[in-house]
Amino acid sequence: VNSPSGARGQLDYLDQAGLELLRATERGQLVQGVWVYKHPLDSDGLAAFHQRVGAGLLGRLIERSPLPFARPHWVTREGPQVDIITAEHPRPPAELMDWADELATRPIDPEFGPGWLLAVQPLTDGTTAVSFVVSHCLVDGGGAIVAVWDAILGNRRDFGYLPPRSRGRIAAAASDLRATVREVPNLVKGLSAVARVAARGVTSARKSGAAPPDPAGDDATVVIIPSAVAIVDSETWDARAAALGGNNFSLAAGYAARVAEHLGRTRASDGSVSLILAGSGRTGLDDDRALAMTFATAVIDPSGVTQDLTAIRNAARAARAKVATEPDASLGLLPLVPWFPQPMAKAFASEMFAYDDAPPVSCSNMGDLPDDIARVDGTT
């Protein structure tokens, strides 16, 4: 098991930060996949997938330490956590994304469960949709693909996690206290990062003005954010990217920048877009981190991306290189997140996405996926 944090089963700093920010902000991030089958669904095959996918990266939940400042651990929770949710009545294909959005409002929790769910929706044109929804605190996009792929192929990964509540409170507290003492050097480094981040925060606040109101407030309601789905033939996509002097990734980034421009999410100073490029930091199939991710910020001029992708390709490459040599100072605060009171945790979340005078725009690209990823019911 690759646990960069050290101890087996202990959450990585970024994973723990994700959990703490979930609790502080009450905004849960999810990963969702949708498949549409044009032929009859193999119900037995999907049931077998449902049994197998609840292993490895998805066969777990988070268990808190008895000590409020100590790091949580992964514990086993293998097998389905809820039954497959099968709709009784078909819906029009035009409502496919409405259905997907509705699934995302169901209770999903990485600590108390269920951490993930699987659902089926017949459509009135004879096709059938399948959706898989999982807490982002359990896996990122790359981890979800690994989990789904393993379940389809019948692979099983054992990360050696303990059963829930198996350590005993006294033994767990003693073990976690020793682990916390060993992490004192990391805490000291975190404290040294506070001044750097505070200075940057003052600068960002001056540029961006007052913080936007918290959309949750005291009377939080579910807000469905508008979305759109486009299906483009991969050969057409690659050909267009090549014609513009780019590649599959830079065309996606250019498209995101152009959409951002249309939505008015540009910098007031020069009309450029602050594009957050999410990348995978996963070191292999046995890397058990939930959030094995890297984030690079590229400043993009959206006006020329429809003629030439060279600039955006170079900007993205430079942004990723900078992340490798100059890590974001905010990441140095991760060891301190468990010690933050909730208001400070919320401020930390805002600081992580403070980008001068521009609202951030995210762009994720999972790349080319294996053909097997389409066979959640065992058929193609």
Describe each region flagged by the PLM:
Residues 25-31:
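TRNA-binding/sensing appendages of the translation machinery
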Residues 2-25:
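N-terminal alpha-helical "arm" segments
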Residues 2-10, 34-44, 48-55, 59, ...:
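Soluble acyl-CoA-dependent acyltransferase catalytic core bearing the H(X)4D motif
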